[in-house]
Design a protein with these regions (language model features):
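Nucleotide/phosphate-binding catalytic cleft detector across ATP-hydrolyzing
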Residues: 1-159, 176-191, 203, 211-307
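Acidic, metal/cofactor-coordinating or nucleic-acid-engaging core segments within structured domains
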Residues: 197-203
Length: 307
């Protein structure tokens, strides 16, 4: 969170797997109730309904504004940032993002969705919040994660933002993004999870919990039978090979370009692909995009103030 003229700029990465701000990360899960649920540790109350934040798994949907879920998750994200500074009331500028090739088409609608209430009150974790949403700034995913050092990049670089739902790729030449060389594909890490589920069921006639799959994808291993681990690792390796096949289809050349991998799916490349450390770099910070949105919004607002 950044402060500018008594306004809080809060970057929010509305991921399909996790919601991220500059300082926190929580699952993109939400369950709504008409009556107060039994367990209320992570409960948000808004508009007369009760929401458990982080519960369940929100399925991939290209249109994030089709229901209230991402709006309520946004309120929770803002509350988490404000709580870190012991605030419950503030004027807010939301800095958010959309997949690269969807930004221009969905930008106005997503901004209107997040700004539908210029003033909003809600309760989160028994704390009462009063927000004034002064503005929403929307930026392209992928680029935001490297925005703070983009101008230092030399030569031809490819940015691959591998999220849970989508993979966004963007070419940078001497620090400048190439408008005509950016791509968005529905090929995020969750596609790998689905492939593991299917392969595991076919080979063992058993179901496997997503928590185990996630552990293997993130760390490269898990305390399970070696035969079961082999199935997961085999599918993950094939998924990563497919990532690089797609990158090459978009013109990626490992010998002449540097690849920057961002997003939660970067761990799959680390764990299941043999790469040259000189040619493949990782943006390790899971909150990098949210921080990038804040960086871009602050720079933009300051530039506008100067006229």
């Amino acid at each position: 969170m950044k402060t500018l003229n008594n306004t809080k700029i809060i970057g929010i990465d509305h991921g399909y797997g996790n919601m991220k701000t500059a300082n926190c990360c929580f699952p993109t899960g939400i369950t709504a109730y008409d009556h107060e649920p039994l367990f209320t540790a992570d409960m948000l109350v808004y508009g007369g309904r009760y929401y458990l934040i982080g519960e369940g798994h929100k399925e991939f949907a290209p249109d994030k504004i089709k229901d209230e879920d991402y709006y309520v998750l946004t309120l929770a994200a803002i509350a988490k940032e404000l709580k870190a500074e012991n605030l419950t009331e503030a004027h807010i500028v939301i800095a958010a993002g959309l997949p690269l090739t969807w930004t221009s088409g969905q930008k106005a609608d997503f901004k209107a969705y997040l700004m539908k209430n210029s003033e909003v009150e809600f309760t989160y974790k028994k704390g009462n919040y009063h927000l004034y949403i002064d503005d929403v700034r929307i930026y392209p995913q992928g680029y935001a994660a490297i925005a703070s050092f983009a101008t230092t990049l030399k030569g031809v670089n490819l940015i691959a933002d591998i999220g849970n739902g989508t993979m966004n790729t963007l070419y940078m030449i001497n620090g400048k993004p190439q408008q005509g060389k950016m791509f968005t594909e529905q090929f995020g890490a969750y596609q790998c999870t689905l492939a593991v589920r299917e392969a595991f069921m076919q080979k063992t006639q058993r179901e496997i919990n997503d928590a185990i799959i996630d552990e293997v994808l993130i760390t490269g291993t898990a305390n399970i039978a070696s035969a079961d681990l082999k199935i997961i690792k085999s599918v993950a390796a094939e998924y990563v090979r497919d990532i690089f096949r797609r990158l090459r289809e978009h013109g990626y050349d490992e010998s002449t370009m540097t690849l920057y991998v961002t997003g939660g799916g970067g761990c799959l490349v680390k764990n299941f692909y043999k790469f040259s450390a000189d040619r493949v770099k990782f943006v390790e910070d899971i909150c990098a995009a949210a921080k990038g949105y804040e960086y871009l919004a602050e720079a933009q607002v300051k530039a506008e103030a100067k006229g």
